[in-house]
Amino acid sequence: MRPILLSGHERSLNQIKFNRDGDLIFSVAKDKIVCAWWSANGERLGTYNGHQGAIWTVDVSPNTQILATGSADNTVRLWNVKTGECIKVWDFPTAVKRVRVHPPMEADCWPVTEKRMGFLGTIAVLDINYGENLTEQAEEPSLRITCTESKATVAGWSYMGKYIIAGHEDGSVSQYDGKTGEQLENVQAHEFDHQINDIQFSADRTYFITASKDKSAKLMSTRNLAILKTYVADTPLNSATITPKKDYVILGGGQAAMDVTTTSARQGKFEARFYHKVFEDEIGRVRGHFGPLNTVHIHPAGTAYASGGEDGYVRVHHFDKPYFDFMYEVEREQLRK
């Protein structure tokens, strides 16, 4: 499984995303630009320029028409994917750490803002117009959720936009009503005061995986926030994703970036870890990055995954035949029946 190495950023990666078709990858880093790549061969299509600070987050609409980014310059920007034109800028009082586009095409985009300078962290819902005139967008959020106790660090939409699921700085996970913003549930999923760094959903959005500084990832139900599975690692985790074709999850993390120069790549545990989704066993690791993995994302068809690291590189791995052939004995017996 030889990786394709994508070198287009001067600083560490913050987030990478495949589009729904899986033919494009979008990456953002601390260097103010958004890169678009062909996933098949790693060729760079182009960049989106305009932010004045580190870009923390990126997401793309299901039809790959609109790209949304959030930055340390306190703005959310909407881009026309095809032309690279910035079509809308929303200003916020603090940095925008996460932005998500709701899967249904007619729905919303929303940012998670930082708790800083006297401002509380918020989750804001922005209505997106997918019509012919993309520049005509709403000026103000249609819904704003204020996180009074512990700031939200990551969040995502559930199935049908019924809930907003948020991960918090104190290791808890909250469920909010998608229409009113009312908090319905709050569960201490991870150790107290160990921040949740990532939440990624299954294809049908009925369950999701968290990645936390407490060296574990949790598979949780969207409906009631029940913890379904726990994957224990030996290093703090920054990102986790669920593979659609095989029953695996991929975790990414590593020793804290400030300690990286004092250690070798192996000691730093800078590897993508593969766990069996059902049995919770670690089944393999993929090395390559020199520095922690900050973000991992799976191809929608489950045929490849991409990882972005503190070293400034994106690595795209297309899975070989042995990846798809590997099965536990109990899985083989199930097929024989």
Swiss-Prot record:
Its main location: cytoplasm. The keyword S-adenosyl-L-methionine does not apply. Disulfide bonds: none annotated. InterPro entries: eIF3i (IPR027525), WD40/YVTN_repeat-like_dom_sf (IPR015943), WD40_repeat_CS (IPR019775), WD40_repeat_dom_sf (IPR036322), WD40_rpt (IPR001680). Keywords: Cytoplasm, Initiation factor, Protein biosynthesis, Repeat, WD repeat. It comes from the Eukaryota. SUPFAM superfamilies: WD40 repeat-like. WD repeats lie at residues 8-47, 50-91, 147-186, 191-230, 288-327. It holds the Pfam family EIF3I. One of its GO terms (molecular function) is translation initiation factor activity. It is found in: Cytoplasm. GO terms for biological process: formation of cytoplasmic translation initiation complex. GO terms for cellular component: eukaryotic 43S preinitiation complex; eukaryotic 48S preinitiation complex; eukaryotic translation initiation factor 3 complex, eIF3m. Component of the eukaryotic translation initiation factor 3 (eIF-3) complex. Component of the eukaryotic translation initiation factor 3 (eIF-3) complex, which is involved in protein synthesis of a specialized repertoire of mRNAs and, together with other initiation factors, stimulates binding of mRNA and methionyl-tRNAi to the 40S ribosome. The eIF-3 complex specifically targets and initiates translation of a subset of mRNAs involved in cell proliferation. Belongs to the eIF-3 subunit I family. This is Eukaryotic translation initiation factor 3 subunit I. It comes from Aspergillus niger (strain ATCC MYA-4892 / CBS 513.88 / FGSC A1513). The lineage of its organism: Eukaryota, Fungi, Dikarya, Ascomycota, Pezizomycotina.
